[in-house]
Regions:
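Extended amphipathic alpha-helical regions
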Residues: 1-304
């Protein structure tokens, strides 16, 4: 179900009934992200992919670029020709360098977001997090020379993360419509703390972290003969949600709300620390029992 089922809504009440579909769609992205990371984990870290000095590639300005940057741009160029990035839910990493689609533009029935796509974009942070933080914990050390396969997995994973995080704009719009007066006042006051607190639902975030852990535990099982283990550390997935996806999504929501009201957003360093997901998501034994979290949680919690 695409989020643009929402563009068919004719009234505010209908919008909020369809918002349930947005919630379900966001949940479905969890599988996409987990499977993409599982695919990347089968290869070594292959740091040569991310080093602009290794493959001697140049960007449009003649400066060195990494193999990842080169392949990502070329992939987006191809996808742009078939109008992938005309969809408001898609955010290219290299928007300025993409060609015009060769297919006729699609007509979306109704505009949901009230800011342009380029107004809120955190893809640079998505790439930085992925390369500097995720790969280090996701993959085994070393270089297996599978650079092509690895970088294709990288692109799939980063695009999935980007899509999930930028859905924060749609979430922010729905929350704004529920209480436009309060959000408008907080934005005009520059009260970012109050905005972040209003956007945050700690119990929902706890459920997100637990659900991500359980899905990673289920989909990432690696059972060979008498040996049982995981293709990917389930707690890594929970950590990615807590430390990257949740705070970057809130960052997107905050920026969107400021642009929505017509006020320049503050720099993220003034509020980003408040956006992190909860640290106590795995402290409630009853909640874990209901989710049927495997016993490995006892050891995995040490990574928090």
């Amino acid at each position: 179900m695409s989020i643009f089922a929402f563009s068919l809504c004719k009234s505010l009440s209908l919008f909020f009934s369809l918002f349930t579909l947005l919630f379900l769609y966001i949940i479905s992205t969890e599988e996409t992200i987990i499977f993409a990371l599982i695919e990347r984990s089968q290869y070594r870290k292959n740091y040569a992919i991310y080093d602009p000095k290794v493959h001697k590639l140049r960007n449009v300005y003649g400066a060195p670029q990494s193999f990842l940057e080169y392949m990502l741009l070329e992939t987006e160029k191809l996808h742009s020709k078939v109008r992938r990035y005309t969809s408001p839910e898609e955010h290219p990493f290299y928007a300025s360098y993409l060609p015009t689609p060769i297919l006729p533009e699609l007509s979306y029935p109704q505009q949901i977001l009230l800011t342009g796509k380029s107004a809120v974009d955190v893809n640079s942070e998505v790439m930085r997090w992925y390369v500097e933080k995720i790969i280090d914990r996701l993959c085994k050390a070393g270089d297996d020379e599978q650079h092509g396969s690895s970088v294709l997995c990288d692109i799939a994973a980063m695009q999935a993360l980007s899509r999930r995080i930028h859905y924060g704009k749609f979430v922010a719009e729905s929350k704004f419509l529920k209480d436009p007066h309060t959000y408008t006042e907080y934005v005009k006051q520059g009260n970012v703390t109050a905005i972040v607190d209003l956007l945050t639902n700690v119990e929902v975030e706890r459920r997100v972290l637990r659900r991500a852990f359980v899905k990673a535990s289920t989909y990432g099982q690696d059972i060979t003969g008498t040996t049982e283990g995981y293709k990917i550390d389930p707690m890594l997935i929970a950590d990615i949600y807590r430390d990257m996806i949740i705070p970057l999504t809130k960052d997107v929501e905050v920026r969107y709300l400021f642009h929505r009201v017509g006020v320049a957003p503050p720099t993220p360093d003034t509020y980003y620390s408040r956006c992190r997901g909860p640290l106590d998501a795995f402290d409630d034994p009853k909640a874990l029992e209901e989710l049927q979290v495997p016993p490995v949680i006892a050891n995995a919690k040490k990574n928090l």
